Regions:
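Conserved PLP-anchoring active-site segment centered on the Schiff-base-forming lysine
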Residues: 61-83
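A short helix->loop->beta-strand "cap" motif at the edges of active sites that frequently abuts
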Residues: 67, 88, 147-151, 177-179
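Active-site PLP attachment segment
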Residues: 167, 173-211, 224
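Structural signature of PLP-dependent enzymes
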Residues: 210-216, 234-256
Length: 350
């Protein structure tokens, strides 16, 4: 990324095309064809300022006031804001920590459906749950979408982060979804380049893409240099993803083994992303966190995590749960999880 940016030697740093730099668009298309045998054309893609802008544009294009958005709970909390800005509302599909947060059954999907449902959002693999959908579950969702003439927003920013023999798969691999599918992606997680703020939206629905391009034109363009750098990232070989997965799998296993030392804890080993949800034997995870930050030290060290209640739209849900992001080296992850364990003992004894 940085080598490509440093190699830029034009005299003038010009505006890029609103849809995106053509070389970058072509590199994205080549990546999908090489890694997933998916045929995208540059006209099927619009480059955005991170996946967040891709989602904002998508909701602006397809959501009308009063529309309902189905999404499995817990979910990435910014979706609540994206929906509210357009006058839509989140309708959570309930899940359970004991069931590993799985939601893709016909009964569960149909129970959440109403005459106001416009779209279902699938974050796959999931944030904050780390849930990786099986191929069968993806097909169930696809059939549900087509039968009810819904939009499917597939947030696939963590797509390559899958473990235990799971093969990375995109909803774009399901041909019958062609006109119903909107894929959201970014360089942030896949290439550890969050600060580049490069994302994109991809769809074969021409009417939808026309609306997205109009929105892209209204904000001129995405940073030229970041697109130049990102072009090279999408040329990385498959071995890059294999090495990345091997390392994150080790980190996940380290976190899981340490967390499972806690008596009465509920934790399912996640199949993807780099997040792990933990249901602790306490009433209030946020209160526990404040204890760790303000009162607890072990060798002058403590730990911080994300209380999971913020990932729920249903008031009162997730109060005993936390989200761990296993993005540090394994030795740090091991120590952090040990601090949760020992801190929990001190918290319950106070």
């Amino acid at each position: 990324f940085m080598d490509a940016v440093r190699a830029f030697d034009e005299d003038v740093l010009m505006y890029e095309q609103s849809q995106g730099d053509i070389k970058f668009l072509e590199s994205i298309c080549d990546y999908y064809k090489r890694e997933y045998s998916i045929e995208y054309k540059p006209t099927d893609i619009v480059v955005t300022m991170g996946a967040s802008e891709a989602l904002t544009m998508t909701f602006t294009t397809i959501i009308d006031p009063g529309d309902e958005i189905l999404i499995a709970e817990p979910f990435y909390s910014n979706y609540q804001t994206f929906a509210l800005v357009r006058g839509g509302s989140i309708c959570p599909i309930p899940t359970s920590s004991k069931e590993g947060y799985r939601y893709a059954s016909r009964d569960r999907l149909e129970a959440a459906l109403t005459d106001k449902t416009k779209v279902i959002v699938c974050i796959n693999p999931g944030n904050p749950t780390g849930l990786a959908l099986t191929a069968e579950e993806m097909d169930i969702i696809a059939d549900f979408v087509i039968e009810n003439d819904l939009w499917l927003i597939a947030d696939e920013a963590y797509r390559e982060y899958v473990y235990d023999g799971i093969k990375p798969r995109s909803f774009a691999n399901i041909d019958k979804l062609k006109k119903n599918l909107i894929v959201i992606d970014s360089v942030s997680k896949r290439f550890s380049a969050c600060g580049a703020r490069i994302g994109f939206v991809a769809s074969k629905n021409e009417e939808f893409m026309t609306g997205i391009i109009k929105l892209a034109q209204s904000r001129l363009c995405v940073s030229t240099l970041e697109q130049i750098g990102s072009t090279e990232l999408f040329k990385l070989p498959s071995s890059y993803y294999e090495e990345m997965n091997e390392e994150y799998c080790k980190r996940r296993d380290t976190a899981y083994e340490e967390i499972m030392q806690i008596p009465d804890v509920i934790c399912h080993k996640p199949g993807g992303a780099f997040y792990m949800m933990v249901d602790l034997p306490i009433d209030d995870a946020e209160d526990f966190l404040m204890f760790l930050l303000t009162e607890y030290r072990d060798n002058n060290e403590t730990v911080m995590f994300a209380p999971a209640a913020g990932f729920y739209s249903t008031l009162g849900n997730g109060k005993s749960e936390i989200r761990i992001a296993y993005v540090l080296e394994s030795s740090y992850i091991k120590r952090a999880c040990q601090l949760i364990c020992t801190g929990l003992e001190a918290y319950k004894a106070k």
